[in-house]
Curated annotation (Swiss-Prot):
Keyword Signal: no
Membrane topology, record value: Peripheral membrane protein
Protein name per the record: Phosphatidylserine decarboxylase proenzyme
A Pfam family assignment: PS_Dcarbxylase
GO cellular component, as recorded: plasma membrane
Modified residues (Pyruvic acid (Ser)): S186
Sites marked Cleavage (non-hydrolytic): G185, S186
Mod. after translation: Is synthesized initially as an inactive proenzyme. Formation of the active enzyme involves a self-maturation process in which the active site pyruvoyl group is generated from an internal serine residue via an autocatalytic post-translational modification. Two non-identical subunits are generated from the proenzyme in this reaction, and the pyruvate is formed at the N-terminus of the alpha chain, which is derived from the carboxyl end of the proenzyme.
Free-text function comment from the UniProt entry: Catalyzes the formation of phosphatidylethanolamine (PtdEtn) from phosphatidylserine (PtdSer).
InterPro entries: PS_Dcarbxylase, PSD-A
Primary location group: membrane
Enzyme class: lyase
Free-text cofactor note: Binds 1 pyruvoyl group covalently per subunit.
Length: 230
């Protein structure tokens, strides 16, 4: 039997190393103190885990950008600079991430990054729907075909004060690729066109890069899937 350690996201290296050093010092002082310090070290390692995912390869599928639970699905309007600032209709799928979820974010669909905006704001608890409008966030607009966009928002929370996004405007992206992380509990919103088939429901648990959020081609209900391990 082969045993392998879980992959750790690079954003967690500093936290884990510092926690490990503190734990070693604590054990040198007393066994009980060391055990007490060991718990946050293990928790930190668990939080920054970055497991490989089996990515569906069909280009018509929109994948979940994050692990978590679907807290809301509703039709909304969203202003885009690529649309001269005018609002366009989208279906919002909001995903809540607890501190126990994998917090690595993944690209929902292949395309090109057309816009990126970092909006300053509050740090309301990510459990509240208010966080979508009031909290600090990173907005990413991905054009998957000419004139068609999907929007992803990485939203900070009460504990999550650090959003990491490793994308740039005009960058080509592939569905399922890692693109960032939000530290310690958060929310991720994805906005898809209103004319697509939504494949999830409120209260459903989703897995980033694996769970199908929507099908862009309603007529293709029997899509043939291929898979990649990423």
């Amino acid at each position: 039997m082969c045993f392998s350690l879980p992959s750790i996201n690079k954003e967690g290296y500093l936290f884990i190393v510092v926690s490990f050093i503190v734990t070693c010092i604590a054990f040198s002082i007393s066994w009980g103190f060391g055990v007490t310090c060991l718990f946050p070290t293990l928790l930190c390692t668990y939080f920054f885990r970055d497991p490989a995912r089996i990515i569906p390869g069909n280009k018509d599928l929109v994948l979940s950008p994050a692990d978590g639970v679907i807290s809301k699905i509703e039709e909304v309007s969203y202003p885009l600079s690529t649309n001269n600032g005018e609002e366009k209709k989208f279906t919002l799928v909001s995903i809540f991430l607890s501190v126990l979820n994998v917090h690595v974010n993944r690209i929902p669909i292949s395309g090109t990054v057309k816009e990126m905006h970092y909006k300053k704001g509050k740090f309301v608890s990510a459990m509240s729907d208010r966080s979508s409008n009031e909290n600090e966030k990173q907005v990413i607009v991905i054009e998957y075909t000419k004139g068609k966009e999907i929007i992803v928002e990485q939203i900070a929370g009460l504990i999550a004060r650090r959003i990491v996004c490793n994308l740039r405007v005009s960058q080509s992206v592939k569905a399922g690729e890692r693109f960032g992380i939000i530290r310690f509990g958060s929310r991720v919103n994805i906005y898809v066109p209103t004319d697509v088939e939504i494949r999830v429901s409120e209260g459903q648990t989703v897995v980033g890069g694996e769970t199908i959020i929507a099908n862009l081609n309603k007529e293709n209900t029997q899509e043939k899937l291929t898979f990649d391990l990423v």
